[in-house]
């Protein structure tokens, strides 16, 4: 933010504008329109494949391992949303039968699938693979596929799952050792898993990788499933590109690139985030609302972080709290642009939701936005005063400025199943939401620390931690990493039945945590610098279709 505060806006203010790179995409997505003939052709071919897949799923008399493998393959191929009821019923039956297995592969796959679907299966299933000292048997080292599944299972652990801490360490060491000597496609699958475990990955990104890099190359592949998955991916991609074209036109009409040149132009990356929250066709309206919200709050973030003066930001904060277009005259010209755009956007949301009698829920998102802006203003005050708060004070403010309370709430707007009671539950910051927010905060803080430090910000999470605990930068980052691990256990716990809201409404909260893991992988700021991280994902999901 600018450090000079003046009473007269006519006076020239020297602003330390952050030098953000322009959009990588230009007008690339602006003019896409669905080829209805191709879309209809894909949809017609999908129907019989879908029914064949359903028949495979509900067939009886299969071995446990074959049933689990089929479900896992369908989920990894990104087509399980067609069969949620069938899969849940099968897993419910398996769980209630106390199904067990003697081999590592089946046990680990059983454990992960049940946990990911909310069934609290005991980690004691793994005790048979330990020796008398409680260590995993070295004889397992040669079972690479079993180890890979043990590794993936270890990431759904909760606080009560100490055995899975050992499982993670054991499987990681042996997979790293085995990886260079494996044949394709297992080699690629192991290398990818070590880089990005399945449970913390963005579902569409994982699906794209699995179809193209793994399943197509597997000798044992099922051609019905593969064909179905490719057609479904390409058909959904058309819908996603159409949504992005709509949002790109909205963004271009706002013309923030010209009128607010200090801010990041990242509407495509914002769409990737919304797509990470939910990709299924029934959430089209929800996605468009969410991407517009993320794009808008990004502008507000940069206004506080890289442009506004203290006095301007205080006035802007007050105007947002009042939420009244008549407040606009108090603002400097550049702030009038975003203020009007924000109020217009929420009027549009109310209008859009009114036909379903849901316009009243928009107020929940507005209150969350007011909260974010209040907390942005606190951060800007700390910056100008050179104040470094204790870690606890820092976090009490900084959790809201992740925008994740706000985005989780916004993600429910276009979800037709979300009721007033669900919004009330979310407004109380339940533990699972708190966990997702903490994951975002500490991963973001670690990745952006050096850049924020170079811009003179001392009230960063890492700096506050270093001072509070008298530790080095690396030790502070390790503490933050440990906070993320603890939060993941809380989040995983929050997915276990019985849950206060439906699994459908918990999934966006989980996916928000996944997105931040992917965007800031290897401590890179993939949002500010998308060329480093997000560009290949965006190309894979929104530019290149899968060859049929």
UniProtKB/Swiss-Prot annotation:
Keyword annotations: Cytoplasm, Lyase, Magnesium, Metal-binding, Plant defense
Residues where Mg(2+) 2 binds: 301, 305
Sites where the protein binds Mg(2+) 3: 444, 448, 452
One cellular-component annotation, GO: cytoplasm
Pathway the protein takes part in: Secondary metabolite biosynthesis; terpenoid biosynthesis
GO molecular function: 5-epi-aristolochene synthase activity; magnesium ion binding; terpene synthase activity
Superkingdom field: Eukaryota
Name of the protein in question: Probable 5-epi-aristolochene synthase 4
Native organism: Nicotiana attenuata (Coyote tobacco)
Source taxonomy: Eukaryota, Viridiplantae, Streptophyta, Embryophyta, Tracheophyta
């Amino acid at each position: 933010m600018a450090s000079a505060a003046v009473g007269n806006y006519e006076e020239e203010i020297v602003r330390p504008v952050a030098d953000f790179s322009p959009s990588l995409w230009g007008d690339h997505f602006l003019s896409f329109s669905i080829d209805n003939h191709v879309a209809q052709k894909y949809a017609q071919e999908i129907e019989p494949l879908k029914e064949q897949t359903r028949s495979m799923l509900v067939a009886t008399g299969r071995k446990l391992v074959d049933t689990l493998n089929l479900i896992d393959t369908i989920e990894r191929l990104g087509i399980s949303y067609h069969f949620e009821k069938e899969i849940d019923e099968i897993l419910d039956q398996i769980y209630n039968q106390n199904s067990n297995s003697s081999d590592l592969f089946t046990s680990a796959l059983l454990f992960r699938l049940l946990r990911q679907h909310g069934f609290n299966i005991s980690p004691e299933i793994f005790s048979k693979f330990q020796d008398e000292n409680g260590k995993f048997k070295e004889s397992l080292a040669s079972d690479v596929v079993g180890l890979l599944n043990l590794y993936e299972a270890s990431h759904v652990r909760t606080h009560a799952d100490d055995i899975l801490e050992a499982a993670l360490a054991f499987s990681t060491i042996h997979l790293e050792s085995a990886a260079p000597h494996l044949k394709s496609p297992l080699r690629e699958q192991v290398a990818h898993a070590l880089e990005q475990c399945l449970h913390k990955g963005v579902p569409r990104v994982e699906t794209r990788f699995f179809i193209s890099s793994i399943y197509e190359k597997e000798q044992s592949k099922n051609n019905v499933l593969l064909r179905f998955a490719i057609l479904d991916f390409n058909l959904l991609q058309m819908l996603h590109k159409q949504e992005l074209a709509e949002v790109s036109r909205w963004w271009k009409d706002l013309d923030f690139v010209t009128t607010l040149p200090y801010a990041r132009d990242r509407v495509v990356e914002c769409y990737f985030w919304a797509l990470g929250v939910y990709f299924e066709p029934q959430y089209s309206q929800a996605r468009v609302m969410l991407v517009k919200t993320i794009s808008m709050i990004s502008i507000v973030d940069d206004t506080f972080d890289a442009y506004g003066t203290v006095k301007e930001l205080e006035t802007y904060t007050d105007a947002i709290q009042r939420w009244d277009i008549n407040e606009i005259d108090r603002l400097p010209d550049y702030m009038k642009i975003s203020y009007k755009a924000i109020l217009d956007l929420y009027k549009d949301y109310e209008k859009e939701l009114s036909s379903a009698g849901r316009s009243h829920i928009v107020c929940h998102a507005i209150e969350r936005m007011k909260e974010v802006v209040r907390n942005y203003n606190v951060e800007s005050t700390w910056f100008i005063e050179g104040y470094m708060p204790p870690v606890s004070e820092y976090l009490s403010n900084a959790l809201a400025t992740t925008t994740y309370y706000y985005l989780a709430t916004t993600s429910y707007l276009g979800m037709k199943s979300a009721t007033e009671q669900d919004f009330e539950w979310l407004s109380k910051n339940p533990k699972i939401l708190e966990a997702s927010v903490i994951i975002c905060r500490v991963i973001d803080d670690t990745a952006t620390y050096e850049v924020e430090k170079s811009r003179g910000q001392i009230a960063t999470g890492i700096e506050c931690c270093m001072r509070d605990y008298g530790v080095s930068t690396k030790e502070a980052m390790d503490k933050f990493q440990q906070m993320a691990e603890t939060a993941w256990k809380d989040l995983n716990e929050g997915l276990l039945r019985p849950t206060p809201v439906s699994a459908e409404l918990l999934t966006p909260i989980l996916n928000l945590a996944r997105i931040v893991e992917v965007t800031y992988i290897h401590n890179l700021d993939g949002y500010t610098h998308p060329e480093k991280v997000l560009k290949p994902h965006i190309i894979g999901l929104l530019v290149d279709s899968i060859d049929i």
